[in-house]
Swiss-Prot record:
Pfam family, one: AA_kinase
Major location (coarse): cytoplasm
Function: Catalyzes the ATP-dependent phosphorylation of N-acetyl-L-glutamate.
Protein name in UniProt: Acetylglutamate kinase
Compartment(s) where it occurs, according to its Swiss-Prot or TrEMBL record: Cytoplasm
Involved pathway(s): Amino-acid biosynthesis; L-arginine biosynthesis; N(2)-acetyl-L-ornithine from L-glutamate: step 2/4
Keyword terms: Amino-acid biosynthesis, Arginine biosynthesis, ATP-binding, Cytoplasm, Kinase, Nucleotide-binding, Transferase
Organism annotation: Hydrogenovibrio crunogenus (strain DSM 25203 / XCL-2) (Thiomicrospira crunogena)
GO terms for biological process, alphabetical: arginine biosynthetic process via ornithine; L-arginine biosynthetic process
Top-rank lineage group of the source organism: Bacteria
Site (described: Transition state stabilizer): 33, 255
Gene Ontology MF terms in the entry: acetylglutamate kinase activity; ATP binding
CDD domains linked to this entry: AAK_NAGK-C
Length: 298
């Protein structure tokens, strides 16, 4: 097929724009949290896999951490078990934890690995149990009890938080040119499994690997101001002000906090990007404009 002059110039322009980013990030680790619409729509799923394979091909080291909340909810519904949430966290009893582990570590994780393989990448699927990757501890949550007029401890069951990341297995895979794909299931010293928020796991993995970037895919354009306009660049000081004035609230609050914690602990930059845009990861990494909100420490 022959390209006309305009098409040829457009392709050349795109490649020229990508070149400095390829040079800058070659050899660097980029942690990508994969979730939301990007996990359910076929075009977005294939676009994501191609983006990850391209990053690896040009010398970057992508590490994928994935969620799977809707898939967990669907299977729980099929087995007749109702989902319960407290402050956005899924209450996870032992039976639910078995299903969470099966869905995240089995179905979802292996689907992503297979998708990357279909686009000629080399991926290895892991949970936090593999290589003692994610050492977890039970999450403690409190809520104010009006009857007691005091804070009350809430038992979420097998919901955990990251205590530490063991990077040995990740370092080995990266050195051997594999793409790690991580399911956010952790384990404590007694061998108990925990369901952990995928954003939190991605942030801690990025910190432990001293990643260049942490990228969190969402179902929004990024962080929006009170007028609904995209905020493209923020630092720690401006994030604090936006939390104070109520611009950042609800479900976006823990995501932003995770991104902020990462840049304050050695990650160069965090990005909240629109996973509903096809090839969102590629556009954020390889173009001047990007497709979301950039967060830095200063």
């Amino acid at each position: 097929m022959n390209l006309n002059k305009a098409q040829a110039q457009n392709i050349a322009s795109v490649l020229a724009e990508a070149l400095p980013y390829i040079q800058r990030f070659s050899g660097k680790t980029i942690v990508v949290k994969y979730g939301g619409n990007a996990m359910t729509e076929e075009a977005l799923k294939n676009g994501f896999a191609r983006d990850i394979v391209l990053m690896k091909l040009v010398g970057m080291n992508p590490v994928v951490v994935h969620g799977g909340g809707p898939q967990i909810g669907h299977l729980l519904e099929r087995v007749g078990k109702q989902s319960e949430f407290i402050q956005g966290m899924r209450v996870t009893d032992s039976e639910t934890m078995d299903i969470v582990e099966m869905v995240l570590g089995g179905m979802v994780n292996k689907e992503i690995v297979n998708l990357i393989h279909q686009h000629n990448g080399n991926a290895v699927g892991l949970t936090g149990k593999d290589g003692n990757l994610i050492r977890a501890k039970k999450m403690e949550m409190t809520a104010f009890n009006e009857d007691l007029n005091a804070p009350e401890l809430i038992d979420l069951g097998h919901v955990g938080e990251v205590e530490r990341i063991n990077t040995k297995v990740l370092d080995m895979l990266i050195q051997d040119d594999f793409i790690p794909v991580i399911a956010p299931v952790g384990v404590d010293e007694q061998g108990h499994s925990y369901n952990i928020n995928a954003d939190l796991v991605a942030g801690k993995v990025a910190e432990a690997l001293h990643a260049e970037k942490l990228m969190l895919l969402t179902n929004t354009p990024g962080l929006l101001d009170k007028q609904g306009e995209l905020l493209t660049g923020l630092n720690a000081e401006s994030v604090a002000a936006l939390i104070e004035d109520g611009t950042i609230y609800g479900g976006m609050l823990p995501k932003i906090q995770c991104a902020l914690d990462a840049v304050q602990n050695g990650v160069e930059s965090s990005h909240i990007i629109d996973g509903r845009v096809e090839h969102a990861v590629m556009l954020e990494v390889f173009t001047d404009e990007g497709v979301g909100t950039l967060i830095t420490s200063h």
